[in-house]
Amino acid sequence: MLFRSYEVDKAKRSAQKHQKGRVVWLTGLSGSGKSTIANALETTLFANGAHSYVLDGDNLRLGLNMDLGFTPEDRAENVRRVSEVAKLMVDAGLIVITALVSPFAADRNRAKSIFEEGEFLEVFVNTPVEICQQRDPKGLYKKSAAGELPNFTGISQDYEAPVSPDLVLDGTASLEENIAKLIKIIL
C-alpha cells in the first residue's frame, strides 16, 4: 500500500491554524500529574487561541484501547495506537497532548520515530513514587499493594525514565510553574 497525498497537506493545515502541529508526550508514573498537567496545558493553549487535543491514556482505555491489558506487550500496543492517532492529529495541524504512563523507552522511541523532526516533544513528569502513592487518585497503588494489580508500573513492573527528554517537569512543583515551562517550548 502507498500513502496517498492530498492537496491540503500538513503545512497548509498548520498555516491555517497559525501553529505548528506537534505532540507533547507526557510520560511518568501513575499519579505523577500527567493528566492534571495535560488538562491545564490544553486550557492554557485554548485561552491563547491554539488548537489542541488531549489523548489521555485512561480515556483511551475506555474505547480505542479497551481490549488491552497491562502486560509489556499490551503496553507497547497501547503506545503504538496512541502514537498513530497522534500522528494523524498532528497532520491535521493540532497540538496533541498525550498523558500516558508509557513505561518503556523502546515504545516511546518507536512512537517518536513516526514523527518528523521537531514534532515530538518527550516530557518526563518526574514525581517520586512515594508521592504518587500518597496521591493515588485512582486507588491503583492500594490495589497493587493488595496483590490485585499485577504488572503495576513503578511497583511490580519497571518504569524506564527517559534518558534525554525534551523537558523534565518536577511533579511536586506548582502546576503554574510546569505549564509556564511547557508553553515556553510549545508556543
Predicted regions and their residues:
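Hydrophobic anchor at the beta1->P-loop junction of P-loop NTPases
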Residues: L26
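Small-molecule kinase domains that catalyze NTP-dependent phosphoryl transfer to phosphate-bearing small molecules
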Residues: N126-V129, Q134-K181
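Conserved substrate/cofactor phosphate-moiety recognition/catalytic segment
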Residues: N39-K87
